[in-house]
Each structure stands twice: as structure tokens, then as C-alpha cells.
Amino acid sequence: MAWPCITRACCIARFWNQLDKADIAVPLVFTKYSEATEHPGAPPQPPAPLQPALAPPSRAVAIETQPAQGESDAVARATGPAPGPSVDRETVAAPGRSGLGLGAASASTSGSGPADSVMRQDYRAWKVQRPEPSCRPRSEYQPSDAPFERETQYQKDFRAWPLPRRGDHPWIPKPVQIPATSQPSQPVLGVPKRRPQSQERGPMQLSADARDPEGAGGAGVLAAGKASGVDQRDTRRKAGPAWMVTRNEGHEEKPLPPAQSQTQEGGPAAGKASGADQRDTRRKAGPAWMVTRSEGHEEKPLPPAQSQTQEGGPAAGKASGADQRDTRRKAGPAWMVTRTEGHEETPLPPAQSQTQEGGPAAGKASGADERDTRRKAGPAWMVRRSEGHEQTPAAHAQGTGPEGGKGRAVADALNRQIREEVASTVSSSYRNEFRAWTDIKPVKPIKAKPQYKPPDDKMVHETSYSAQFKGEANKPSAADNKAMDRRRIRSLYSEPFKECPKVEKPSVQSSKPKKTSTSHKPPRKAKDKQVVSGQAAKKKTTEGPSATKPDDKEQSKEMNNKLAEAKESRVKPTSDASKNRGPVTKEPHKDQGSVAPGLPKGQEPLKDQGPVVPGLPKDQVPVVPGSLKGQSPTAPGPTKDQGAVLLGPVKDLGPVAPAPIKVQDHIASELLKNKDSVPLAPAKAQSPLLPEPLKNQSPVVPASTKDQSFPTPAPRKDPGPVIPEPEKDRAPTVPERRKDQHVSIMASLKNEAPMVPESVKNQGLAGPELVKDTGTDTTAPRYLKGHDSVFVAPVKNQGPVIPEPVKSQDPIIPALAKDQGPMLPEPPKNQSPVVLGPIKNQDPIIPVPLKGQDPLVPAPTKDQGPTAPDPLKTQGPKGTQLPTVSPSPPVMIPTVPHTEYIEGSP
């Protein structure tokens, strides 16, 4: 068994139980668990003496877990027979070992015992002075001779709701049984009068119980034998759940009766009973149910045998026998026993009537009474029922008991008396039977005083904690209202000592939040960017302090200015860079508006990629504007090399942007215009291009290029459909386009596969053809020439393409590159950011891709700080992207102008 978690209570028990069965000895250091040493199955301590001998005194202190004499010993021990308790095992092991010829082993056995291994065979109880015996009960429970009070007070007090028995209709009188009893010539027969009584379980039962003893006693007559027998049997407590006992009594005898009737028909017919009883007298071993069955069913068949056996026997025998049997406690759950008693007899009566037609017939009844005399184990209700059923006959028996001979008359009289009593006590048996107990005094319910008294005064929602952080002016006042609060807050924060830290804090905050803003709230970020990092800073500042004191406008402004300044210096590098546009971003951010006049236009979209724009400006500010507008996202990508291009494409579709970027102004515009539609086509063509652009834009292109064609498709993810086509087209295109505008085209294509036709037309890049000859081609080349990023820009466009750039951004592209078209999805994964970012057109896409693209963006970012950042901003992954970006700056494709960015920008 595997080592259980031996520290949990549930396992400790299991552990100890299975310790002896385990395959390994657990070298636990328990000092007091006797169980560790005494295996329940093992002979009690006899082996203990051996152990000391086996183990040297030194060993006496602790069990040894290290192999003392070497592995051979362990092996031998393992091999050696080692069943039985540890001690036995050891002894066994020793011979085995010596037999093996392991001198060491034998030595160890004799000397240190199993010191060497932790195999089960080696397990040795410690040779410590025996721990004091454990309180844990030994394996089996040896019952003491003294009777054990089986019934708890609860059980004694318990009165079961009278559950109707099947076929027991208390409202229907049961006269038949009486006739049955009377039928037998034997007067005794009256005994098994009828069940009704049992049905009238209420008071009747009590009376029956009360009577029982006397009845039983009174029924000294052997005739009462059966009854007495039964009673005696009951006298001995029945072991087992009452229900079992009850069933036993009931069912057992139920079937029994017929048997009995046959059996006892002869004088010895009763013999069976006696036989059964004697048999029962000895305790029955085994589960009560088994016992019960044996008693009930056993007897069922047994009777014949017995009857033959005991034919000579006294007819009453059975009854008496049964009683004796009952006298000895019945083993088994009380319920089983009870049932036995109850049902057994229940039917028994009729049977008995036939059976006991002989003289002893009455015996059974009396027997039943005696049996009942002894307390029945089991829930009282069960017992009662059994008694009720049994006793019904028993009661009669009691009446008849003395001299079952008295016979019918006595039985009838008794029955009548019982019936009368019952009737007097309660009106109808039915009502009696199914009626809530009325003898219980109703308890007057006590209304508990409510424990919780709500405070009269209004609740003060101030805790000692919150109290520490109250502004000076912020003391709650009765007249609080919003205006007052605001004023208070304003005054609070405009205080000089507070203001300073405030301002400072915002600046600090700005750097961090800035980033956050970028990543988390692209829309807002876009706006911020648009506004300029300054505004972003302001926003940030505002956010920080604002939460605290929204009203502090002047300060906000101040702070914003400061922040803006800091941000501009910092943002250029930091903000934008952080955005993922890295370097480019910074500039763009700072000036986003200024960075690309045109760009800004596009920048709105760029906004997201504000940083990109700056980059673009680098190569092709003019282009950027157009492209930006169309593909502000793209611009960022290009920004690095061709920030503009990227943005353009990004915005609409990376693809257009790429060419546009360089040429971007018009192209971008066109692209933008067409871009949405065009990019897709371009994507097709572009994929091929991309690869080349990758080449051109070493950073972006390399990885990008490789896969770019593929990546494009991936980016195309957005344009999904496009991707396939682009791929197709792209494959061929790639070569040319790659060179010229592979990237751009790819991006565009990616983004706008559908657009391809137009795109292609509009932006040479977009169309595969275009790619080859189109201005796009030119553009692409330019881009490439001008800035590898251009290619990126397209990438941007093709959110999917981005992956290509991503490729550049090693992480993303790789996957993309491979499957570019299909991969797009993956690429986005890899460069999710890129893909998304790039797909300007795919605004929707962008969102998804963004995530994926974030990485892409970073790739571009690397090359074109701005681009990446924007995307980054847009895409939470910005951080990730950055790393990616570094691999492929061109990847600017960040195109990422995310949907978010885009949203923000407007």
C-alpha cells in the first residue's frame, strides 16, 4: 500500500491497520503505538521475547532504518518468508537468511535483527521496553459475561409512531385468527389468538407488556410452552438491532409455523419447536441478519428434520425450545432480532393454531410471553411491535398459559379482555394507531428575547481605521452635502504641504500609470496620446489624485503640466518606449500631435500608436499623416523605419500603409480609403512581400519576411478569408513584394484580404500584382529602402501580417512565419499583439489580435519604439511585445493601432 498521509487522523487509523499488511515497513518513530509492534492478527506478544534476543541492546533504543550488515541481509530478508507479525517475521527471516547462507544475514538476525532495510520483512518492532498497552481496543471485542445494557435510555423512552404493517388494517377486525385458535381442539390453542392486538399497538401494547411477564409466569403450564418458550427466548436480550430481532421473531416463526404445524402435528410436533429453541439457546454467531434468517428460515426447513428427529419429543417442545432459544440473547442487530421475534410469531399464530392443535399448542403463546419478558433489544417501538404482534398471541397465551388446557375459553376471555381494554383506552384502533401522541404535555414555546437591538441612533460608518485617514477638513458634519464635501476636499488638497507631494506623486505615478493607461485603457490612452503625453500625464495624475480629490482642477492642471513635461522627456523614451514603441514612441508620444502633423491626423488612430507616429515622421512624416489617418496604427510600425507606413497600414490595413508610408501620404490616404477593402488583397500579395520586407527591414523583415508571407495570413486572421488568398497570392508575390513592399503588402493583404483587389490597385502593395509592379511595389521598395519598418507598416495593416513582423519579433513570427496564412491565428498568438495591432482595418480584429499582437507590437516596438508602444498600449502584452519588438524593429507593424487605440483616437 502506498504510504498514506499518515498525519491525517483519517489516515492514521488506516495506517495503523494496514501497517502489518504493508509492503514496506514504515520506519516511523512512534514510541507509544502498540499497534506498530503488535499486529492485530499476530499472536499476542509471545514473539516479544524473541525480539530482545534478536536485537542487541544497543538497538534496543530505536528501530534501525539503515542497513546494518549490508544489502544481502535486506534482500534475504525480503526474500525470506516473512508473513506474520514483525516478530514472527524476524524469526522467519533469520532462518531464511541463514539458509541462504548469508552469514551476515544470520548475524544480523541474531544480532541486530532486521536493521538493514525498510522492507516489510525487515520491519522490527522496537526493542524498547514494551510501551504501555494501548487503549485502542484489540482487534476483536471480547464481550464480557456480564450482560450489556443494550438499550439506551433513548431507546427505552422511544415510542415509535405506529407504522402500519403491510396488510395490517387495524380498522378491520381480525376474527379469523381466533377461530383458527379455537379450531384446534386443544384448548391451549387460544394462544396465537390474533395480531389485532399488535395492531392496536397503542395502550394495548403496554398492557400486553405488563401482562406479559405475569402471563409468561402464569403460563407455567407446558401447554403454554411455546409461548413460554418464545418468551424465554425473548427473555434473554436479543442481540442486534431491534428491527432485526423483531423480524427474526416475526418472520422466523412466520414460516416456521407451517413447518411446525406439520412437525408438531404428532405429539412431537412441538419437538421442532424445542429443537429450534435449544438450538437458539446457544448464542447464534454471525451477523444478526444471518442469524435471523437462520433462525427463521432455518427453522422453516428445520422443522421437518427436527420434527422427525424429535418426533418422540414433547409437542410443546418447540414452543419451549423457541423460548429457550430466545432466552439466550439473539445475536444480530436488534432490529433483525426484533423482527424475527415479531414477525416470526405474527404469522406463527395461525400456523400455531394448526400446529398446536396438539395439546402444546398453547405453549407457543406462553413462550412468546416469556420471551417478551426479557427486555427486547432494539428500538422500543420495534420491540413493542414485535411484542405487540407476538404478544397478542402471547397475551392470549398468558390467559391460557396456565394449563393451555383451559383452552379456548380462557383464550377467548383473555382476548376479549384485551380488546375491551384497548377499546376503553382508545376509541378506534385506527384512530389510536395513527394519531400523534397525545400523552405528551405540550411545551409552551418560549419566545426568546431578540438578541440584537438595533442602535437607535444612526449608524456611524466610521472605523478606527478609516478615521485615521480623514482630511483635516473632512470631518463629517451634520450638514454634509456634496458641494461642501467637494470644497472641503479641494481645500484639503490645495494646501501647500499637501500639494507638493501631490504633484510629485502624480509625476511618479504618471510614469507608471502612464504605462498602465497605455496597456489597460487603449481608448483613453489614445485620447491621452492625442492630447499629448502631457494630457496623458494629466489624466494619470488626475486619476491618481483625482480619485482622491477630483475637484482639484488647478492642481491637476499644474500637475498635468509637470507631468506632461516629465512625460515628454520621459514618455518619449519611457512612455512610448514602455508602450513598446520604445524610442519612437517617446517622441511621438511627447509630441504625438506634433510628431506627425499628418500623423496626428492619422494619429488619432495612431494615438494608440502615438509613438509610432514619431517614428514615421522620421521616415515619412507626410506619409504618415495620410497613412496614419488611414492606418495610424501602422504608422507606429513604420515609425521606426517607416513609422508612417506602419501607421497607415495599421489604421486601415497595414498593407496600404507600407507603400503609403513612404509614399504614404497619398497612398496612405488611398489605402486608408481602400484600405479596408484593399488590405485584404494586398495581404495576399503581400505575404510574399512580407518576407522580403523582412529582408529589407532587417529586424522586422528577417523574421517577418521569413514567415511574413505566412504571418500575413495569420494576421489576416482578421480578414480570415483573405489570408488564404493572400497566402496563395502572396507566395508568389512574396519574392517581389518582399523586396519592394513585401511587408507592406503582406500587412495590407493580411488585413484586408477582401480588399485585395482594390488594395492591390490602390496600393500596389495590396495587390499581388501591385506588389510586383505597382506603386506599391515602388512604395514597398521605398519603404523598405526608406525604412524597413515600412514593410512593417504593412504588417501592421495586416494585423495578421504583424505576425510576420512578429517573426521579426522572433517570438511571434516564428510560428506565424511557418504557417503564415493559417498561422495568422497562431501568429497572433505568438505576436498576438502584432496581429491585432497591425490590423487597423480589423479594428475588431485588433482587439483580439491585440492581445496576440501585443507581442507583435513589441517587435515593431523594438525597432520602432513608437509603434510597438502604441500597440503595447493597446495591448496589455505591451511588455511582452517589447521583447518581441527588439527582434524586429521593422515589425513596427504594430499596426497595432488597436481597436482600442482606434477607439481612443476618435
From Swiss-Prot:
Q: What happens when the gene is disrupted?
A: Mice are devoid of cold-stable microtubules and show no detectable defects in brain anatomy but show synaptic defects, with depleted synaptic vesicle pools and impaired synaptic plasticity, associated with severe behavioral disorders, including a disorganized activity with disruption of normal behavioral sequences and episodes of hyperlocomotion or apparent prostration, anxiety, severe social withdrawal and complete nurturing defects. The behavioral defects are alleviated by long-term treatment with neuroleptics.
* Primary site of residence: cytoplasm
Task: Tell me the membrane topology, using the record's own terms.
Answer: Lipid-anchor
Where does the record place the modification Phosphoserine? S98, S185, S207, S632, S687, S905
Q: Where in the cell is it found?
A: Cytoplasm, Cytoskeleton; Golgi apparatus; Cell projection, Axon; Cell projection, Dendrite
Q: Where is the composition biased (Pro residues)?
A: 41-50
**PTM annotation (Phosphotyrosine): residues:** Y141
Q: Describe its PTM?
A: Palmitoylated. Probably depalmitoylated by ABHD17A, ABHD17B and ABHD17C. During neuronal polarization, palmitoylation and depalmitoylation cycles regulate MAP6 shuttling between secretory vesicles and microtubules, and its polarized distribution in the axon.
A GO term, aspect molecular function: microtubule binding
Q: Which InterPro entries match?
A: MAP6
Q: Which GO terms describe its cellular component?
A: axon; dendrite; Golgi apparatus; microtubule; perinuclear region of cytoplasm; transport vesicle membrane
Keywords tagged on the record: Calmodulin-binding, Cell projection, Cytoplasm, Cytoplasmic vesicle, Cytoskeleton, Golgi apparatus, Lipoprotein, Membrane, Microtubule, Palmitate, Phosphoprotein, Repeat, Transport
Q: Where is this region: Mn 3?
A: 427-450
Residue numbers spanned by region 4 X approximate tandem repeat Mc: 222-405
State the oligomer form and interacting partners: Interacts with calmodulin (via C-terminus); the interaction is dependent on Ca(2+). Interacts (via C-terminus) with TMEM106B (via N-terminus). Interacts with ZDHHC13 (via ANK repeats). Interacts with ZDHHC17 (via ANK repeats).
Q: Which family does it belong to?
A: Belongs to the STOP family.
Q: By what name is this protein known?
A: Microtubule-associated protein 6
The uppermost taxa in this organism's lineage are:
Eukaryota, Metazoa, Chordata, Craniata, Vertebrata
